[in-house]
Amino acid sequence: MALVVGLVGLSLHQPAGEAGSLSILMEPDATGVWRDLFDRFEQQNPGLGVQFVEGPPATNAREDMYSTAFLAGRGGFDVVYADVVWVPKFAAAGWLMDLTDRISVEDRQDFLPADLQGSTYRGRLYRIPALTDAGLLYYRKDLVAQPPATFADLIARAKEHQSPDRWGFVWQGKQYEGLVTCFLEIVWGHGGEWIDAETREVRLDEPAAVDALQFMVDLIGDLSPPGTSTYTEEETRTIFRSGRAVFLRNWLYVWGLMDQDGTIGRSQVGFAPMVHAPGKDSASTLGGWGFAVSRLTKDPDAAWRLVEFLTRPESLAQVRDRMGRVSARQSQVPADLLPVLLKARPRPPIPEYAQASDILQRWLSAALTRRAAPAEALSRAASETRLLLNVD
């Protein structure tokens, strides 16, 4: 049976799993599905055990735990359960094994293209996708027959159905990573960009980005609640599920919870990609999780076997059924959701992502709370980001 380890007494400076044992740090296993999968892996691999460390719920806290273990130089974990935005940092630091030649052609063809792209750094694959995520525009289809395609459509329909008891559009405006993902979808919809993935060019002070932020600022207090600059995912979901909003920007998990609570159910709700400007394309910000192999593991072949096992279709089907999560395999994605996921885009694949995101969050928040004009905020953010990336 897989050994489940709590954080109390755990040393992150211990070597990666000893012979016959593989260690992995993950989120709390509320449903027990991961424990069951680890038990099955052990049954299929006699003599090989899994030490499962249940970490804190917060993603950044687990990233810090992995980073601390790697920086100690002895790599406390053999397998890394990695957020898509960790890949560039971890790969650039030399913490992950190159898996390019280990993945099969069949698996490469089955995984969603954006999830594979987000698992790649400088042309090499360092993570095998498992669970995907993407931003969606949810709408009340009992009020709106067809989802809006453009920003003008969104504004018009939100105004049409807004009332004293119902806001037009709710989204995540607090100073945190969720604000960055919302901003990116609106920037992409305007034809703009944050940081060019190939050249590392910072494009925050271009007109498309300024127009995107101005759009967000103008929403607050008009079609979006005055408290938007304090909202995360759950605040906005609560407003929408109670029937107090026409449109909601949020992640895939909202769909899984739609019939479990609140007054609004799936029969009254539809979803679509975020809207775009005329002549531009919509895109959803990619999220999601996958598995990587530590370069410090004592048994890379065994660690790879665990990664391969956890990302098999049958394993991911169990996670889908018990957690309500969406598999990163195209063959397992619901047909109505696939078109949205095929338009998902990763965030900039740079090792300095966390620092760049912090800069952007601070200045986006300054604009949303009217402490700085959008053009000024993005000019300052662009300057700080260029200094961080050492680019002109």
Give residue ranges: language-model regions.
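Short, solvent-exposed loop/beta-turn-alpha elements that line the ligand-binding surface or hinge
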Residues: T100-F111, G173-K174, G192-D211, Q260-T263, ...
